[in-house]
Amino acid sequence: MTDCRYLIKRVIKIIIAVLQLILLFL
């Protein structure tokens, strides 16, 4: 229960990066 917000922000950044890669290959 230390850095939940940090982990959430990191996961969101990863998801955004994946979405950008998908858009590049569409």
From Swiss-Prot:
Additional remark text: Entirely encoded within a small RNA previously known as ryfB.
Membrane topology: Single-pass membrane protein
Parts of the chain that traverse the membrane: 7-24
Signal peptide location: none
The protein's name: Small toxic protein ShoB
Task performed by this protein: Toxic component of a type I toxin-antitoxin (TA) system. May be a toxic protein; overexpression causes cessation of growth and rapid membrane depolarization. Overexpression induces stress-response and a number of membrane protein genes.
GO cellular component terms attached to this protein's record: membrane
Signals that turn on the gene: In exponential phase. The ohsC RNA (previously known as ryfC) prevents the toxic effects of shoB overproduction, probably by repressing its translation. Expression of the proteinaceous toxin is controlled by antisense sRNA OhsC.
Keyword line: Membrane, Toxin-antitoxin system, Transmembrane, Transmembrane helix
Compartment annotation: Membrane
Biological process, per Gene Ontology: programmed cell death
UniProt keyword Transmembrane helix present: yes
